Amino acid sequence: MAAAAVAGVAGLTSGAGRKRLLREEDMTKVEFETSEEVDVTPTFDTMGLREDLLRGIYAYGFEKPSAIQQRAIKQIIKGRDVIAQSQSGTGKTATFCVSVLQCLDIQVRETQALILAPTRELAGQIQKVLLALGDYMNVQCHACIGGTNVGEDIRKLDYGQHVVAGTPGRVFDMIRRRSLRTRAIKMLVLDEADEMLNKGFKEQIYDVYRYLPPATQVCLISATLPHEILEMTNKFMTDPIRILVKRDELTLEGIKQFFVAVEREEWKFDTLCDLYDTLTITQAVIFCNTKRKVDWLTEKMREANFTVSSMHGDMPQKERESIMKEFRSGASRVLISTDVWARGLDVPQVSLIINYDLPNNRELYIHRIGRSGRYGGKGVAINFVKNDDIRILRDIEQYYSTQIDEMPMNVADLI
């Protein structure tokens, strides 16, 4: 493994084309622990991409590839199996979207790439990025997700889709019904692989994988890749290229992390109300560990005359989509959510994350707070810590080699 230091990177957010520059001094501290044969391709022009794809990349607002894009895209295009780990907010989604689009034969109206994601929202966002980047290619791409009409899925798949992005359950269902034909699939991408391969999705991924042609290329992308996950990759990857960030560098440099000591659960609500008074928030996400807590807190905040919106996995798909749309557009400014929101959803203007509950596992911590300063933007994360949570907080600090200080009085100035 060779370690390559990373120079400053320009990254971009969603189709609105907001430019966010990762500060150079931050990026030099991130070390990629990478297979020796991986070289750096500094521009999109030198990646050997097709013209119509390049047009889409520049039209989308990208100028210079991010660190992960400079390393991974060329390897994926070459046909290598790739394990890519990159900080939250450094352009992971576009990394595999560009690679997938480059490898398609548009003339062949069959599914050639399959992208699996742990949540419906993430699968939907991947589809949007694919369609935007592939705008000049006439690419057909479908999001195959639970909570939507099965008949519509079947109709779209019968029409012919070059790429299918989806959640494992629905994708497997479509393969079993023979609506999603797998014979032309060349590439399988697992996004947020740590979450996907955890107990809940492991079986479903294996079910899907069994139906794919034996020579299918596999790419695994995630912000965290714990050791036990890497062991599992041996089962369905051949001589993979590794593009890894050292674990303790994964906390984003631009994010200031604080804790507020609350002795008991009941005190959290008052603390949150006090914070509302002192913080002029641009946009904020408040995380709770359970759907019930999200509903309870939302109701309590509204009773206290605070305007909030909320989202969790039990809500109907249509409702979740409209809540996300409102939040993305800035129409709603505070979102209370479970971890369904924490994975890979781009809302560039979020500058504050509050962990009303500390996450149940330490890997989720980075997914949550990595949201609040995407592409090196400034962000603040505030953790509400009960007496019996101190141990968990110290564990998170140690795991990410970071420091979480007590929240200062002037926290509003940092946002």
UniProtKB/Swiss-Prot annotation:
Molecular function per GO: ATP binding; ATP hydrolysis activity; mRNA binding; RNA helicase activity
Keyword tags: ATP-binding, Cytoplasm, Helicase, Hydrolase, mRNA processing, mRNA splicing, mRNA transport, Nonsense-mediated mRNA decay, Nucleotide-binding, Nucleus, RNA-binding, Spliceosome, Translation regulation, Transport
Residues binding ATP, per UniProt: 64, 69, 86-94, 346, 371-375
Record-listed E.C. numbers: 3.6.4.13
GO cellular component: catalytic step 2 spliceosome; cytoplasm; nuclear speck; nucleolus
Alphabetized InterPro entries for the sequence: DEAD/DEAH_box_helicase_dom, Helicase_ATP-bd, Helicase_C-like, P-loop_NTPase, RNA-helicase_DEAD-box_CS, RNA_helicase_DEAD_Q_motif
Motif (DEAD box): 191-194
Motif (Q motif): 42-70
Similarity section: Belongs to the DEAD box helicase family. eIF4A subfamily.
Self-association and partners: Identified in the spliceosome C complex. Part of the mRNA splicing-dependent exon junction complex (EJC) complex; the core complex contains casc3, eif4a3, magoh and rbm8a.
Protein name: Eukaryotic initiation factor 4A-III-A
Native species: Xenopus laevis
